Regions:
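Active-site neighborhood of HAD-like aspartate-dependent phosphohydrolases
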Residues: 1-41, 176
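Asp-based, Mg2+/Mn2+-dependent phosphohydrolase catalytic module
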Residues: 1-3, 95-98, 112, 116-218
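Conserved phosphate-coupling serine/threonine residues in phosphotransfer and NTP-handling enzymes
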Residues: 12, 108-110, 185
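Conserved SAM-binding loop
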Residues: 13, 104, 163-164
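Conserved donor sugar-nucleotide recognition element shared by glycan-biosynthetic enzymes
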Residues: 20, 48, 86, 143
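Helix-loop "lid/cap" segments that line or gate small-molecule binding pockets
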Residues: 25-28, 47-62, 118, 150-151
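Metal-dependent phosphoesterase signature
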Residues: 54-92
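Short, acidic loop-to-helix structural element flanking the phosphoryl-transfer center
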Residues: 78-106, 116, 144
Length: 218
């Protein structure tokens, strides 16, 4: 039986991946600049600093990289504070874990202020012992550190722990550590679905299948 759950947020608990594809485009629109159609794809594969530099050079924006980063982050923060919705019936697995005394933590690449305002609005904070972010931990989810820290808080061993994720590279890290995985489909990672399926102990196309997950973790 599962003794601890680790949750990704974007594309897993929240239906929020789209803002990361659109934020730079919306920011440029506010500056009166029309962005290229595939800007979201370009930005998705860059760090914030790299993305800001790309925007400054490509669109001849007369602002510092920090000012551009801050502007894009304001767009993203506003989305989390006002709009970011739950992803389908994700609340069902949180309720199940709480009722069965299974501790939960978050492991996310999104910075904590954005997660915190979304969780406050949606009343999700009560479910989690701690929120771990890659920024605060100092390494990405392609490294084991964030999952090791999560398990320390949960008090679990890898084979007692389940990770809920839509991202293939995070699942790959967890699987190599011996952590069980639930793969959740998200349209933002269409191209990675074969890998997500191959890494998942349980794969679901939507949270309508939450009972399938509950059966697996019992």
């Amino acid at each position: 039986m599962a003794k601890g759950f680790i949750f990704d947020v974007d594309g897993t608990i929240l239906d929020s991946m789209e803002i990361w594809m659109d934020a730079a485009k919306l920011y440029l629109k506010d500056l009166g600049i029309e962005a290229e159609e595939n800007l979201g794809d370009i930005m998705f594969n860059l760090t914030m600093a790299e993305g800001a530099e790309y925007i400054r050079k490509t669109y001849k924006v007369n602002l510092s990289d920090k000012e551009i980063c801050d502007g894009i982050n304001q767009k993203v923060f506003g989305f989390y504070k006002e709009e970011a919705p739950l992803k389908g019936k994700s609340i069902e697995i949180l309720e199940y874990a709480q009722k069965n005394n299974i501790p939960m933590v978050v492991a996310t690449s999104t910075d904590s202020p954005m997660i915190e305002v979304a969780f406050e609005r949606l009343n999700l904070g009560k479910y989690f012992k701690k929120i771990y972010t890659t920024t605060e931990v100092g390494s990405g989810k392609d490294k084991p550190e964030i999952f090791m820290r999560a398990m320390e808080t949960l008090g679990t061993k890898p084979d007692e722990t389940w990770l809920f994720e839509d991202g293939a590279y995070s699942m790959d890290t967890a699987k190599k550590m011996g952590i069980h995985t639930v793969g959740i489909y998200d349209k933002s990672s269409d191209k990675d679905q074969d890998m997500v399926k191959s890494l998942a102990d349980v794969y679901i196309t939507s949270w309508d299948e939450y009972e399938k997950v509950i059966k697996a973790v019992k």
